[in-house]
Amino acid sequence: MPHRKAQQHQGIGLGKISTKYSLLVLLATILLIIVATIGGKNLYFRGDYDIFFDGTNKQLLAFDEIQTTFAKTDNLAIVVAPEDGDIFTPQTLSLIQKITVDAWQVPYSSRVDSIANYQHTEAFDDDLLVEDLLYSEYELTPERISKVKSIALSEPVLKSALVSEKGDVTVVNITVQLPEMDKTAEVEEVVSSINAMIDRYQRAYPDVTFHKAGIIAMNHAFMTAAQDDSSTLVPTMLVVILVFLTIMLRSILSVIATLIVIIGSVMATMGISGWAGMFLSTATVNVPTLIMTLAVADCVHVIATMRQSMKNGFTKVQSIERSIALNFVPILITSVTTAIGFLMMNMSDSPVLRDFGNLSALGVMVACFLSVTLLPALLKLLPIHVKMEMSQDQKHFMDRLGDFVVSQRRALLPLSVAVIVVCASLIPLNKVNDESVEYFGQRNEFRQAADFMEERISGMTNISIAIKTNESQGIAAPDFLNTIGEFSSWLRDQPETDHVATLADVYKRLNKNMHGDDEAYYSLPQARELAAQYLLLYEMSLPYGLDLNNQINVDKSSIKMVLTVANLGSVELVDLENRIYQWFAEHAPQYQVVASSPSLMFAHIGETNMASMLSTLPITLVLISALLIFALRSVRLGLISLMPNIAPAVIGFGLWALISGEINLGLSVVVTLTLGIVVDDAVHFLSKYQRARREGQTAEQAVRYAFHTVGRALWITTVVLVAGFSVLAMSSFRLNADMGQLSAIVIFIALVVDFLFLPTLLMLFDKKAYLQERPSDNARLKASSTITATQS
């Protein structure tokens, strides 16, 4: 068996180096960690939504085109809600005027819209009067307030946009033009300024509730979600690790050695990412939590085997060397398979998910390296003593479980298959659904603002629709005006619609004004020259910062409409987008239409990401299966392991259909993410099973041997992994929370499958006797088998 001998010699050699030159190995690895960690100074944080999309993303390119053609729409909306439920009071209207004036002082502000400075138009003799709806020169008398209320609640531009239908909530919308030199810092600067303003007004108006909404608020929510995770989840994970390690290892010094390895793994990984020029995001900020979890599993195998060997009379040095010899290949194989799973995330359409996969894969391999170099050196130098025997109850439980599986294999196999089939049938009940607002938990300030706005005014989901005539001054053509008029009416008839901001309403109002405010003329002008003159007259009357550049391009060849809808899921939003394109294809194919928005971008990426992830699944399976076949030197065992490796994800997603039924961007990567991890259990179980078979044992005896030698270690590492991903499930950011929750479910199911389903397959399809090891090898294996009670 030259292959297996080579593997074991590598492990033995590595173990001897780490024990013979322990101080040198310790210093060398710590030096490497320090050099890597220095790269952390280059790390910076990005919290804007752009990081989720490639520069070549179709929807992002469309949105950038709209942003370039028209004024940018990055905004922060201050929602004002007086407790008395009426904004049309002198006190509240005065407050809105003050906020509107102060909002111009917000950093990077380029436009402020509110009912206070809404440019109301009306006929004045034979002229057009354009002035602020809450003109500062007018006293807020009951008559004036009544007129303002009547206009605000009837004007399509304002109703369900800047003021609620009931008149109990209003919005001051601040548009900002960020330089985008350091978008994260700029967003923080804007939000800090707004917070200071709100705090000031909150003290002066204690009976008024304020909320922050809009794109800038969403970007800030991404930032705070990541910061909250890093400040809460990582410390929580450390506590969880300390608790579980103390319970499992019953040795403070062993716990300290493990902590040094996992902290070193995290520091080195994040430092290397800094050297590579990467940045932190809401996705990658949780990489340390994953690395800690996976590194603990490696350390547990090494320490548990060493301690069991010491209990059987070997010296500490011998025990460390034996532990590395027995664990090196399983740890290497499981680390590589886990890394492959993470690396397959490079097929994701989202850059931050690719970064998450690459960093996690790097962290896994760093942890693998340190667990077979730094860890044994630490174990050699620390005065570790074994005092307690492993619980006999736990030993007996695994033996009894092995006996149960062997005796009940005829029932367990069809039962397992039935569970897999039933869960597979539930998978179609899952729907891909990304709703960016719901990425944040109910306690999140932005989520609360979004829910409040949807309940009282309108949803925060919008679609910018650019309509191009491809003709200078073409927007004044009667055919075009009639088209956008009909399209606007069609949009308002859609069940999802909350508000439509359209130039058609401006034209209708101007046409009425120019005919003495006669309601009979509230319609679109039908003469091109007249329409152009109306618009020119109106634009010349508008004050600085309140022009129509956010709706009309420079040469007046295209317009932008903004559709605001309820906070829809991705499926409904994409369906609405398709209906928009279909309307133009049927009614106005001569015009070019581009629709996009951040919400629409998130809606599309969830679907495309799931498709790309599913397309990588066969590649991942082939790579991992090939690795297993190579490691085990058995095509039969490699093929047998395929179903138990796929089953956990199948069962997990089937159960998810009952738990939630929604697949978001985070869950779209769970299959490839967990596949590499769930293979670990199969590798350890199969390696022990194969060892026994090569000693001449039957399949049934080998299954019992595998349970006896590796059962407890698999249980321990699964508990640690499930605990780690469960901590991730505590994230305030739903993408991370759902990913953690489903991953924890899949990993736990993997243990159940490897305990109940894999053994039954082995006993059914692996009955043929193995070529036995030569006597010398057999004796060596028997001698070493006594120390593998807890190793994996």
Regions found by a protein language model. Name each.
Residues 309-336, 693-716:
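Helix-loop junctions and hydrophobic alpha-helical segments within the transmembrane domains
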Residues 244, 332-375, 379, 625-628, ...:
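Hydrophobic, glycine/alanine-rich multi-pass transmembrane helices and their short helix-loop junctions
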Residues 408-530:
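Juxtamembrane segments of multi-pass membrane proteins
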Residues 2-47, 377, 385, 389-436, ...:
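Signature of alpha-helical transmembrane segments and their immediate interfacial
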Residues 254-302, 637-687, 726, 753-756, ...:
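Hydrophobic transmembrane alpha-helices and their membrane-interface caps
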Residues 227-278, 347-351, 615-661, 730:
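Interfacial segments of transmembrane alpha-helices in multi-pass membrane proteins
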